Regions:
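Catalytic cores of glycan-processing enzymes that make or break glycosidic bonds
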Residues: 1-172
Length: 172
C-alpha cells in the first residue's frame, strides 16, 4: 500500500507484475500459496452459504433453464452449487476451462451446459477471427480439421461451420 507501508492488498494477476518477478523462488512459492488460499479457498464456505441462501429462490421462480457464467477465476464451490441447484454451466470453445487446452473440445462438454461462441463481453466470432491470425490458424487446423492456410476473414461458410459444430456439441 503506497499510503500505509506494510499493508498489502490482494490483486488478481499480480504474478505478471514486475514486483513479483523480483521475488526469490521461495518467496514466489510462499506468495502463490497465500494467493491460492485467499482467492480459491478462504471464502469458499462463505460463497457457498450465500449462494444457497439466494440462488434457490431465483432458480425456483421460473420454469426456464438457468445458466451460470462459471468462467475465469471462480471459487471451488461454484461447480457443486450449480450442480446441486441444476444450474447449467456455460461453455465457450475459445475460453476452455481446462488450462491445458487452447480451445475447448465440443464433444467433451457436459450435457447440462450451454455452448456458445462468445458472451456479451467478448468479441464476436468474426471479430475474434481477425484478432490473432496465429491463433485462428491453429483453430482452423486443429478444431475445424482443415489443412492449409486459414482465411484472413471469417466467411459466411466458415461461420456457419463453426455454428454447426457448436450445435452438435454435447450441450443441451
Amino acid at each position: 500500500d503506497k499510503k500505509e507501508e506494510g499493508k498489502y492488498h490482494p490483486r488478481i494477476g499480480v504474478q505478471r507484475d514486475f514486483i513479483f518477478r523480483s521475488l526469490s523462488e521461495a518467496e514466489k512459492n510462499a506468495f502463490n500459496k497465500l494467493y491460492d488460499q485467499y482467492y480459491y479457498h478462504r471464502h469458499n464456505d462463505f460463497w457457498r452459504q450465500q449462494a444457497m441462501k439466494k440462488l434457490p429462490q431465483l432458480t425456483q421462480s421460473t420454469r426456464m433453464l438457468v445458466c451460470g457464467e462459471d468462467l475465469g477465476m471462480i471459487p471451488d464451490c461454484v461447480s457443486s452449487v450449480m450442480n446441486d441447484l441444476r444450474i447449467l454451466s456455460l461453455e465457450i470453445q475459445r475460453m476452455p476451462k481446462n488450462p491445458m487446452y487452447e480451445f475447448g473440445y465440443l464433444n467433451e462438454y457436459p450435457y447440462r451446459s450451454v455452448c456458445t461462441i462468445s458472451t456479451h463481453d467478448m468479441s464476436t466470432l468474426r471479430g475474434w477471427w481477425e484478432e490473432d491470425y496465429l491463433q485462428t490458424q491453429r483453430y482452423y487446423n486443429t478444431m475445424l480439421g482443415h489443412y492449409g492456410t486459414a482465411p484472413t476473414v471469417a466467411t459466411p461458410d466458415l461461420c456457419e461451420e463453426v455454428v454447426r459444430n457448436h450445435l452438435k456439441s454435447n450441450s443441451i
